Amino acid sequence: MIEKKIIADKFNSNFIWIFVDAADKYPKQMNIKANQEHIIYGEKCRLVGFLETESPSTGRFSTNHSTWTHSRPTVSGERFTHSFKTLASRMERLDQTISDRIRIVDGEISRHSDNEKICEQAACTLKTCDNVIVDVKKELEMLHSLRLEDQKKSLMNLIAKVQKSGMIQDLEKWRSLMESRYIFDNTFSSATPHGVLVEMCQCLELMSSMLRSVEQSIADRNHNGVTEKQLHEFKLAFDYFDQEKNGWLDYEHFELCLKSQGYNFSVESTLKETMSLLDPSTYEKHDYMRYMVKHETTNILDDHSAIEDALKNLDARKISDSMSRKEAEFFMSKIAKKAETSSDQVCLEYKDFVNSFY
């Protein structure tokens, strides 16, 4: 009697696999509907068992049904044979891989959530620091209208305010934290901790430079005797040529500003040398003020000596020989204002006349 072994096809309920005997390596596929007498539905469901992960239509069982061989060979021509234990082990590894992937994804979600909070907090700090920088720059623009002593006091207060606020340390902390977490794009702010930190340091350096300049101007003023009125005139001259209100002058306007104060540079190299002493690129107001305070007394004394020397060899008979008619009229009008009349002779103390120009 021929013994038939029947295995149900999980993927197609209309078919089963029939092994006629143990020597039969190639099972026959039978239509259930056409052969109702060979199998009942309950038997099919019982035998489906452990074949839930593989498709019988793509492989063959061994004679003892304990191993499974893929019907499709690999590129090298080999066929893989798997036991049910091997398949179970692969399933365990697959479950472990899925668990690891889920854990990694959860970690990434948590990291992105933390990064978003960091970006939001950093944006608040950046906005605060940016507002402080804007306020400091506005106060610096107003310093030029103050006396030197008031400028010095205001600059010292501004520097202390920025240094004691701890903003530089906060910016360093946020920059280090965001770099360590590879955060290079903040959706809450277009500014970066590094950019704001650089701007803050530049602002501090500018205030320190202005403070040194003001202190030097005070020392030069006290040494040379420049008055507050003269300082005010220097500022007015600078503001007149600084038509764009940038706080600095280019080469051409700086030259005009100095010449308007009585500095006549006959040699071009002399002007360039003077400008290089201030700033090789632009000529800012505090540099200009420092230069004027330092050199104004010398300039006045040189002019004073030149006028005295000219008057020593000048009398009424030589006026027409030494000056044009227009210059002579201007000169005589100055003399008339300071002249002292004694009978029919007009005389003038030339030192008093020279002092009248100042």
Curated annotation (Swiss-Prot):
Domain EF-hand: 229-264
Coiled-coil ranges (or none): none
Molecular function terms from GO: calcium ion binding
Keywords, comma-separated and alphabetical: Calcium, Metal-binding
Residues bound to Ca(2+): 242, 246, 248, 253
Origin: domain of life: Eukaryota
Key word Magnesium present: no
Protein name as it appears in the record: Uncharacterized calcium-binding protein C07A9.5
Organism: Caenorhabditis elegans
